[in-house]
């Protein structure tokens, strides 16, 4: 016999829809950043494309470093009874989205006060530090959003991830399009 997938239960689940929204939002945010980071560094900070390609790697290194820490921290908080599993997921996703929002607001603040023609190395260092913080905080998605499917239904986690990932792919497409559009008209 085949696997009887409870599609109607997914659609009616009050826990499933926030997971889908979080996944859509994560992809909208992250793929927009990933796609346009070299262009941003070139246009906003007057950095050559060759140098901006190198600088674009730095935030990813932050993600790799922080990723090695988030699971042990999240597991420790749950295993020691400091936070429930649900609270660990909420904390993780809050750190992911909240950290990104603070970091990108900081980047916007720095860039808005510095005309591209007069960008100093200190400005580049400040912006890259904020972006590294942003990408590092994004690592918390691994103990937030990406554990939610398994928490809701271990048996159907892969199917639920496929559904939310499909919606999230639309977010990726929209963000890269709209960011490009707004850059073109501004």
Summary of predicted features, one role per range:
Residues 67-68, 154-185:
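A late C-terminal transmembrane helix in Major Facilitator Superfamily
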Residues 79-80, 148-158:
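Paired intracellular helix-loop junctions of major facilitator superfamily
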Residues 86-144:
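C-terminal transmembrane helical hairpin of 12-TM major facilitator-type secondary transporters
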Residues 41-42, 73-74, 78, 178-186:
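Interfacial helix-cap and linker-helix signal at transmembrane-aqueous boundaries
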Residues 1-5:
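Flexible cytoplasmic inter-helical loops of multi-pass small-molecule transporters
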Residues 8, 14-26, 58, 96, ...:
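Alpha-helical transmembrane segments of MFS and MFS-like solute carriers/permeases
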Residues 44-62, 88-90, 125-129, 159-162:
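Loop-to-transmembrane helix entry
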Residues 11-71, 108, 138-150, 172-176:
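Extracytoplasmic gate region of multi-pass secondary transporters
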């Amino acid at each position: 016999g085949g696997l009887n997938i409870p599609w109607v239960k997914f659609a009616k689940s009050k826990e499933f829809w926030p997971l889908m929204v979080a996944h859509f939002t994560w992809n909208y945010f992250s793929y927009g950043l990933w796609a346009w980071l070299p262009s941003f560094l070139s246009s906003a900070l007057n950095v050559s494309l060759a140098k901006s390609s190198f600088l674009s790697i730095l935030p990813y290194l932050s993600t790799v470093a922080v990723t090695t820490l988030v699971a042990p921290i999240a597991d420790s908080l749950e295993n020691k009874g400091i936070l429930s599993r649900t609270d660990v997921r909420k904390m993780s996703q809050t750190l992911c989205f909240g950290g990104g929002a603070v970091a990108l607001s900081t980047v916007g603040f720095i860039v808005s006060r510095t005309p591209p023609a007069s960008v100093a190395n200190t400005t580049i260092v400040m912006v890259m530090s904020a972006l590294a913080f942003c990408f590092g905080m994004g690592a918390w998605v691994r103990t937030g959003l990406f554990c939610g499917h398994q928490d809701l239904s271990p048996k159907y986690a892969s199917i639920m991830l496929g559904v939310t990932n499909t919606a999230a792919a639309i977010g990726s497409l929209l963000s890269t399009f709209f960011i490009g559009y707004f850059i073109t008209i501004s």
